[in-house]
Amino acid sequence: MFNFANFYQLIAQDTRLQPWLNVLPQQLTDWQNAEHGDFDRWLRALNKIPQGVPDQVDLKNSVTIGSSTPFHTGELKKLESLLKTFHPWRKGPYTVHDIHIDTEWRSDWKWDRVLPHISPLKNRSVLDVGCGNGYHMWRMLGEGARLTVGIDPSHLFLVQFEAIRKLMGDDQRAHLLPLGIEQLPKLEAYDTVFSMGVLYHRRSPLDHLIQLKDQLVSGGELVLETLVIEGDENAVLVPVDRYAQMRNVYFFPSARALKRWLEQVGFEDVRIVDENVTTIGEQRTTDWMTHNSLPDYLDPNDPSKTVEGHPAPRRAILVATKP
């Protein structure tokens, strides 16, 4: 069982987050009571991971955990085996006591594209919606964020996050909650909100943008990253079935259409700061994620298209301000 008591204590002392206590404990109790087939096995492995007291931590340039007292070879092999229990590792990479967790995604590449365009995170309270296993939350702390809260309903992502946090020395500046954005009350509590790789999974994209706006303080910044298509402000792709083998996908606007959507729901100073075609160097199969990946989702005869005939994955980053 997970104990969220530390997070409850933290938000009880934060006047902007206090109202969350009206609903959050019951939501997390309901989550704990829901069964998941692999969860007990993952928890047993998590409990065997040693509590870290690292004296070499880099969150600025990577997510690297080390110690001046190195692990013995046998200890490293045992730790690597435990971490591989949490396969597949999709977001990263991580370096943990010389173990390189080579994840499916080079999430550090995305961070390098995002970082030059956002307001400095120093002393900011940050919400990361659809945070995966929390890789970017650690990078946000590396940029000086005061607090990072991530939400993602995946059991596996939570266990992966807690494994890294345990090895990190139980850092209490980052917290991952197994919730979806629709479960959050209107908090208006965060200085910066990130939504990266989520919008195309939402049946109602405008409602998602409003939900993100509802979490920001006045003057707060939204960082939105999602799959897009090329085209003008009226261009939107709505796949009939799958897109790059993904089923639960709905709307792929052009970056210009997405800018209009953000303005329509009340954001100001909306900027398209990056567009980038995803390469097979950024998303691929590895020893830590052995399932199919981007190379399997593209047309083998025309990599500019998915296997379904849609335009190949193209991602945009937009930054906007809540008035």
Swiss-Prot record:
Gene Ontology molecular function terms on file: transferase activity, transferring alkyl or aryl (other than methyl) groups
Binding site for carboxy-S-adenosyl-L-methionine: K91, W105, K110, G130, D152, P153, S154, I181, E182, M196, Y200, R315
Keywords recorded for this protein, A-Z: Transferase, tRNA processing
Any single GO BP term: tRNA wobble uridine modification
SUPFAM superfamilies: S-adenosyl-L-methionine-dependent methyltransferases
CDD domains: AdoMet_MTases
UniProt cross-references to Pfam families, sorted A to Z: Methyltransf_9
Reaction catalysed by this enzyme: carboxy-S-adenosyl-L-methionine + 5-hydroxyuridine(34) in tRNA = 5-carboxymethoxyuridine(34) in tRNA + S-adenosyl-L-homocysteine + H(+)
Catalytic activity, EC: 2.5.1.-
Oligomer and partners: Homotetramer.
Entry-linked NCBIfam families: PRK15068.1 (NF011650), tRNA 5-methoxyuridine(34)/uridine 5-oxyacetic acid(34) synthase CmoB (TIGR00452)
Protein family (similarity comment): Belongs to the class I-like SAM-binding methyltransferase superfamily. CmoB family.
General function of this protein: Catalyzes carboxymethyl transfer from carboxy-S-adenosyl-L-methionine (Cx-SAM) to 5-hydroxyuridine (ho5U) to form 5-carboxymethoxyuridine (cmo5U) at position 34 in tRNAs.
Protein name, as recorded: tRNA U34 carboxymethyltransferase
Species of provenance: Vibrio atlanticus (strain LGP32)
Lineage: Bacteria, Pseudomonadati, Pseudomonadota, Gammaproteobacteria, Vibrionales
Name of the gene encoding the protein in the UniProt record: cmoB
